[in-house]
Design a protein with these regions (language model features):
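Acidic two-metal-ion nuclease catalytic site recognized across multiple nuclease folds
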Residues: 164-223
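Conserved non-catalytic scaffold segment of RNase H-like nuclease domains
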Residues: 1-112, 122, 132-149, 222
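Acidic, Mg2+-coordinating catalytic module of metal-dependent nucleases/exonucleases
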Residues: 84-87, 96, 100, 131-188
């Protein structure tokens, strides 16, 4: 079974007025991350709100030379085609994605194509916090690296949370052995972010670390 973990970062909270600044997709095969990753930063063509910047740390200057959504839409849609999407708080991401697609006169992503891990968590743990951070703490998944939000890092965390939510704990060892591979693929160079399936070298990882240290206050550890 092939699925895709998906997450976005945005300029703000309004799907109507704000835009996407980062999309990350991680392919799963039988619930375990594969080597196929789609990741891109985007020029939103509007300013990032102060609140959003405090969450993810992506400045207007950093995003100014990134591709626009229209430039990566085809590759993005090809990556997720015919795959179940695993999203935490899917209404948020879906609202932004479908508004971007609407601007290009492309049909929307259907809710029937999505599994919302927030809804699963609420049904299993009613009346308590079920944010990604809360679930990671509940399942003893380290969030030490998550001082700032990153769509790609959050996909990695959600892949672990997902295993716990669907009671597939026997896959935990597979996830642990997969961490090294995933970590090598999640650090992208500042030059290689054009919305393609990414295959990342160790040298590119180091470049991404340098970018974070330079551009993001209290940049999260990537090792």
């Amino acid at each position: 079974m092939i699925e895709v973990i998906l997450d976005t970062e945005t300029t703000g909270l309004s799907a109507e007025k704000d835009r996407i600044v980062e999309i990350a997709c991680v392919e799963l095969s039988n619930h375990i991350p594969t080597k196929n990753i789609f990741h891109t930063f985007l020029n939103p063509e509007i300013k990032v709100s102060a609140d959003a910047f405090s969450v993810h740390g992506y400045s207007d200057e950093f995003l100014s030379n990134k591709p626009k959504f229209k430039d990566v839409a085809k590759d993005f849609l090809n990556f997720i085609k015919d795959k179940k999407l695993i999203i935490h708080n899917a209404d948020f991401d879906l609202g932004f994605l479908n508004n971007e697609l609407k601007r290009l006169n492309i049909k929307p992503i259907l809710k029937s194509d999505i599994l919302d891990t927030l809804q699963i968590a609420r049904s299993k743990f009613p009346g308590v916090g079920n944010s990604l951070d809360a679930l990671c703490k509940r399942f003893k998944i380290s969030i030490e690296a998550r001082e700032k939000h990153s769509a790609l890092l959050d996909c990695h965390l959600l892949s672990k949370v997902y295993i716990e939510l669907i009671d597939k704990k026997e896959l935990t060892l597979d996830l642990m052995s997969n961490d090294k591979i995933f970590n090598e693929k999640m650090k992208l160079s500042n030059e290689n972010r054009e919305g393609v399936v990414v295959k990342v070298s160790p040298e590119q990882m180091e470049e991404y670390k340098k970018f974070l240290k330079k551009n993001v206050s209290n940049a999260f550890a990537l090792d």
